[in-house]
Amino acid sequence: MKNFKVTVNGTEYDVAVEEMGGAAVASAPAARPAAAPAPAAPKPAAAPAPAPAPKTTAAGAGAGANTVTAPMPGTILNVGCHAGDKVSKGDTLVVLEAMKMENEIMAPHDGVVSEVRVQQGASVNAGDILVVLS
């Protein structure tokens, strides 16, 4: 029987362990800790990426129209706007279900809905145009 002292969360316990039958197993020698690698030279900071320009449609929308796209694939649960509706920045345009979570897709700026390209129950991919604002 071997006795050990074990500390768990700051509390010390005396533990007795008895070997039960079977052949003795030779244990491997304790491995020495590997030498710590030399710290790498710090990399220069990368220049920040420019902010993406608002996405505009090539066809079917007037000049200055902006699109609201799906950020991820999913299913449209609710369309909360119609063509001709005036919307303010932050208004919920569409509710998209993705990975069993409801994601509110909001208006990026004030404007008028010129076209709604999805309907309730539609499946969309990331980048698909949901709503066109002007």
Swiss-Prot record:
Cofactor: biotin
Gene Ontology biological process terms, A to Z: sodium ion transport
Biased segments, Low complexity type: 28-38, 54-67
Disordered, as annotated region: 28-67
InterPro entries on file: Biotin_BS, Biotin_Carboxyl_Carrier/Decarb, Biotin_lipoyl, Single_hybrid_motif
GO cellular component, one term: plasma membrane
Amino acid composition bias (Pro residues), ranges on this chain: 39-53
Substrates-to-products reaction catalysed: (S)-methylmalonyl-CoA + Na(+)(in) + H(+)(out) = propanoyl-CoA + Na(+)(out) + CO2
Compartments, as annotated in UniProt: Cell membrane
Modified sites of kind N6-biotinyllysine: K100
This protein's UniProt keywords: Biotin, Cell membrane, Ion transport, Membrane, Sodium, Sodium transport, Translocase, Transport
The protein's Enzyme Commission number: 7.2.4.3
SUPFAM superfamilies for this protein: Single hybrid motif
One Pfam family of this chain: Biotin_lipoyl
Biotinyl-binding domain span: 58-134
PANTHER family, per the entry: OXALOACETATE DECARBOXYLASE ALPHA CHAIN
Quaternary structure, from the entry: The methylmalonyl-CoA decarboxylase is composed of four subunits: the carboxyltransferase alpha subunit (MmdA), the tunnel beta subunit (MmdB), the biotin-containing gamma subunit (MmdC) and the delta subunit (MmdD).
Function: Biotin-containing subunit of the sodium ion pump methylmalonyl-CoA decarboxylase, which converts the chemical energy of a decarboxylation reaction into an electrochemical gradient of Na(+) ions across the cytoplasmic membrane, thereby creating a sodium ion motive force that is used for ATP synthesis.
The name this protein goes by in its record: Methylmalonyl-CoA decarboxylase subunit gamma
Species of the source: Propionigenium modestum
Taxonomic path: Bacteria, Fusobacteriati, Fusobacteriota, Fusobacteriia, Fusobacteriales
Name of the coding gene: mmdC
